[in-house]
UniProtKB/Swiss-Prot annotation:
It comes from the Bacteria. Belongs to the UPF0145 family. This is UPF0145 protein BLi01945/BL05168. It holds the Pfam family YbjQ_1.
């Protein structure tokens, strides 16, 4: 499955648009890790626990998008976008794109 953030794929023709694919994941944050991350944010530096949580979320959302696209009979996703929102103790990652057939 080819996945791109652009609306076209270089050297490929989109022969059919199958439709929108969307997925989201909501995760709660760990209080213990929040305390350690709070200290780290005061000192400065990467919040590795949150970075890993975000990477895991992106992977899960991508897998779900691929499954949806395959169910529609697509072999590619164009225009992939991610949106992240954080709330009180949670974060939500939404991914969406257009499932297409390239040939």
């Amino acid at each position: 499955m080819i996945i791109v953030t652009t609306d076209t794929i270089a050297n490929q023709n989109i022969v059919e648009v199958k439709g929108l694919v969307t997925s989201s994941i909501v995760q709660s944050r760990n209080i213990g890790k929040d305390i350690l991350s709070g200290l780290k944010s005061v000192i400065g530096g990467e919040l590795k626990n949150y970075t890993q949580m975000l990477e895991d979320s992106k992977k899960a959302v991508r897998e779900r998008l691929v499954n949806q696209a395959e169910e529609l009979g697509a072999n590619a996703i164009v225009g992939l976008r991610f949106e992240l929102s954080a709330g009180q103790g949670t974060s939500e990652l939404i991914g969406y794109g257009t499932a297409v057939v390239i040939g």
